[in-house]
A protein has these predicted regions:
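Short hydrophobic beta-strand element within catalytic cores of glycosyltransferases
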Residues: 232-235
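A short, well-ordered alpha-helix in the C-terminal region of glycosyltransferases
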Residues: 274-288, 297
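C-terminal alpha-helical cap of glycosyltransferases
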Residues: 291-312
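Extended catalytic core of nucleotide-activated donor transferases of GT-like folds
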Residues: 44-115, 124
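Conserved catalytic-core segment of nucleotide-activated headgroup transferases in glycan assembly
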Residues: 18-25, 128-131, 138-199
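Short alpha-helical segment that forms part of, or immediately flanks, the ligand-binding pocket
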Residues: 200, 223-228, 242-243
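Nucleotide-sugar-dependent
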Residues: 211-222, 238, 242-243
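Conserved acidic donor-binding segment of nucleotide-sugar-dependent glycosyltransferases
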Residues: 247-259, 266-273
Length: 312
């Protein structure tokens, strides 16, 4: 029997973590026993050689017709409407990666009453989505898998004491860097967007990684990446990192204040025993955040209830 079709959209004009995760789910759907994923690039979408679709030689379809099911994320609901497709007649998988849809003033809020099976990237986000009282359909949680390049910068090359990932909060990052430099620590500050490979290479040179999220994140990947490249982590709470980031167990979780962050970094730099204990625990747990685990969880949903709806 021919597989049913599920439509994915690519409408981003630049690379982001959310964009990469959409690509991962497309690849997962290729392993489905019941569905064939189709990809459509909207006008203006990034098709440059560096994006994951191009790197894996995945070409989009030229013309959109109504599929058997939809995989939607972010504002894809609006895009589908602009394409003139009757989305209400087909089952929808809706990937939710942030808290925007829980804000009554955000356009994503108005999509919650639409029927869909929603996949949230953390338990905290799933709880917030349910608490809106607006959601129509099941709400599932699949924590993201992490994919790191096979080759990273050797740790023996020009190591530093502290790496600060501050692209989401440059002001606090610069203040933390200043506070640490006064304590004779070698600091590398990353307060802007850089190539992912370069970011991981710079991260992998550090003994301690400070990661500065937004106040709320659906899921926060940088602490897991840091653990996998061998850096102990200091990171404030952002709700979506609570599954992995547990104070004194896998990392240190200070208040989101410059002084508190500096104190935690100094503590790890001065206490090798603590730093290595946290790093070992974090690295062991980080290794469970695999794309294979994410894929298995997704296919249980896609080839389960959703598949049953389409083939009735």
């Amino acid at each position: 029997m021919a597989r049913k079709t599920i439509l994915f959209l690519s409408d981003s004009d630049q690379f982001s973590g959310g964009y990469l995760k959409r690509f991962h789910y497309f690849c997962h759907a290729r392993q489905s026993r019941g569905f064939e994923p189709l990809l459509y690039f909207t006008p203006g979408a990034d098709r440059k050689p560096g994006n994951p679709w191009a790197a894996h030689h995945i070409r989009g379809i030229d013309r959109v017709t109504e599929p058997d099911a939809y995989f939607l994320a972010g504002l894809d609901w609006q895009t589908v409407e602009r394409l003139g497709l009757e989305i209400g007649r087909r089952p929808v998988l809706n990937l939710i990666q942030d808290f925007w849809c829980t804000d009554r003033n955000d356009p994503r809020w108005h999509f919650l009453p639409r029927p869909a099976t929603r996949i949230c990237v953390s338990a905290g986000l799933a709880e917030a989505v349910r608490d809106t009282g607006q959601v129509n359909g099941p709400v599932e949680t699949i924590e993201p898998g992490v994919a790191l390049p096979d080759v990273l910068w050797p740790r023996s090359v020009a190591p530093v004491d502290v790496f600060i990932g501050a692209s989401k909060n440059p002001a606090v990052g610069r203040a933390v860097a200043f506070g640490l430099s006064r304590r004779d620590l070698a600091v590398e500050l990353c307060d802007g967007e850089i190539d992912r490979g370069e970011y991981l290479a710079r991260l992998g040179r550090a003994k301690v990684a400070v990661q500065l999220p937004l106040a709320q994140e659906g899921f926060y990947m940088p602490p897991i990446e840091a653990a996998l490249v061998g850096a102990a982590v200091v990171v404030p709470d952002c709700i979506g990192n609570r599954g992995f980031c547990r104070h004194e167990q896998t990392c240190l979780v200070p208040a989101y204040e410059v002084g508190a962050i500096v104190d935690c970094v100094r503590r790890l730099c001065e206490d090798d025993g603590l730093r290595m204990r946290l790093l070992r625990a974090a690295e062991a747990e980080a290794r469970t955040y695999t794309l294979a685990r994410e894929c298995d969880a997704f296919l249980r949903i896609l080839d389960g209830a959703i598949f049953a709806q389409v083939t009735r």
